Amino acid sequence: MSAQRAAKRRTGDFHSEFPSSCGNPYQTACLLSKFIELPNPPLSRHQLKRLEEHRYQSCGKSLLEPLMQGFWEWLVIQVPQWIAPNLITIIGLLINIVTTVVLIYYCPTATEKAPTWTYLSCAIGLFMYQSLDAIDGKQARRTNSSTPLGELFDHGCDSLSTVFVVLGTCIAVQLGTNPDWMFFCCFAGMFMFYCAHWQTYVSGTLRFGIIDVTEVQIFIIIMHLLAAIGGPTLWLSMIPVLNVPMKLFPALCTVAGTVFSCTNYFRVIFTGGVGKNGSTIAGTSVLSPMLHIGSVIVLATMIYKKSSVQLFEKHPCLYILTFGFVSAKVTNKLVVAHMTKSEMHLHDSAFIGPALLFLNQYFNSFIDEYLVLWIALVLSLIDLIRYSVSVCNQIASHLHIEVFRIKTKMARFNHH
């Protein structure tokens, strides 16, 4: 995520052919990857060319990052040099996803109490993700394997992790009993992550605030630990002075964080454009990215409020995951647009799932909304996976590298 991104400095380019590394023992995996890929390469030659010119730029440090750097420096030394940076990233993401999915299994409506070990596993899983996410860039520099694929892969994993992290937090505090607050917290988290890359698309520089992702992750880890120790009674207790349930404390923090972060983001978006006449890095309108995340949030809100069967209230986790996958997809496309200095197009297959839900409601839900939600979830997940795999393979092939292995001889592309 963002504070850790300061520790990641990786860049590169791409090709449109399939990677040349499909020999034994990777043939099966490569064939499967080829099957998943989109029929047409997602990136044009012009985008690939501009990607080669991309240079990573960042500024600012969060409050706790300097304190964590010593641990991260020690940790990366423990990692064998043959392990690829992207492999470190994906392992951390999978740990984060698995621990959250277990929590979802026990708390599908975010109102149930899960076994103590599930909250502990989420806390440990998030800490492991944070740590691995922080050292993958260090491993890239250490192994002389920095490429543009690394930066894109890192941000892509972060976009998906954000969905599971915010959902896991809502489950931990049983926020499903307050569906409006749960809806706000989840989509506020996705929106803020999108805005972080939106302002980067405008200014060309990724900015870190004094309170950034490292601090938020540690706060969420504490929430999981409190859930394990205190159980449901903790969240039902009232906060002195404020006189609101303890479970709303993370929600109130989300409100404050959203106002603070968005104020800074939009200040950059409206005044920090580096393109012609204050436009984005691609020369497009600074407001154009709003159409994508705005469409996600508007559709999610309309479907939530118009459902005749209380679809979100009864199945909040499935609902958040469905729209979370769509949000992750459009965020990834925004990152690609920034790195390739290209325009974002509104038409996107990611919206097929939400469109099905919307149309089904428009025609008086002639198909069970719960069934359509599952269909939308599967379609959104498949669309995200196909796009991500296609982009990664196209870049890897163009660079003559492998996504999850370090070649003995490879060029290093410094972008910082």
From Swiss-Prot:
Mg(2+) 2 binds at D133, D154, D158. Glycans are attached at N144. Keywords: Endoplasmic reticulum, Glycoprotein, Lipid biosynthesis, Lipid metabolism, Magnesium, Manganese, Membrane, Metal-binding, Nucleus, Phospholipid biosynthesis, Phospholipid metabolism, Transferase, Transmembrane, Transmembrane helix. It is a multi-pass membrane protein. Pathway: Phospholipid metabolism; phosphatidylethanolamine biosynthesis; phosphatidylethanolamine from ethanolamine: step 3/3; Phospholipid metabolism; phosphatidylcholine biosynthesis; phosphatidylcholine from phosphocholine: step 2/2. Pfam families: CDP-OH_P_transf. The record marks E151 as: Increases basicity of active site His. GO terms for biological process: phosphatidylethanolamine biosynthetic process. The chain crosses the membrane at residues 89-108, 116-133, 156-176, 180-199, 210-230, 246-267, 286-306, 315-334, 349-363, 368-388. Its cofactor is Mg(2+); Mn(2+). It is found in: Endoplasmic reticulum membrane; Nucleus membrane. The active site is at H155. One of its GO terms (cellular component) is endoplasmic reticulum membrane. It catalyses: CDP-ethanolamine + a 1,2-diacyl-sn-glycerol = a 1,2-diacyl-sn-glycero-3-phosphoethanolamine + CMP + H(+); CDP-choline + a 1,2-diacyl-sn-glycerol = a 1,2-diacyl-sn-glycero-3-phosphocholine + CMP + H(+); 1-O-alkyl-2-acyl-sn-glycerol + CDP-choline = a 1-O-alkyl-2-acyl-sn-glycero-3-phosphocholine + CMP + H(+); a 1-O-(1Z-alkenyl)-2-acyl-sn-glycerol + CDP-choline = a 1-O-(1Z-alkenyl)-2-acyl-sn-glycero-3-phosphocholine + CMP + H(+). The keyword RNA-binding does not apply. GO terms for molecular function: 1-alkenyl-2-acylglycerol choline phosphotransferase activity; diacylglycerol cholinephosphotransferase activity; ethanolaminephosphotransferase activity; metal ion binding. Residues 1-22 are annotated as: Disordered. CDP-choline binds at N86, E151. InterPro entries: CDP-OH_P_trans (IPR000462), CDP-OH_PTrfase_TM_dom (IPR043130), CDP_ALCOHOL_P_TRANSF_CS (IPR048254), CHOPT (IPR014472). The keyword Transmembrane applies. Mg(2+) 1 binds at D133, D154. Catalyzes both phosphatidylcholine and phosphatidylethanolamine biosynthesis from CDP-choline and CDP-ethanolamine, respectively. Involved in protein-dependent process of phospholipid transport to distribute phosphatidyl choline to the lumenal surface. Has a higher cholinephosphotransferase activity than ethanolaminephosphotransferase activity. Belongs to the CDP-alcohol phosphatidyltransferase class-I family. Homodimer. This is Choline/ethanolaminephosphotransferase 1.
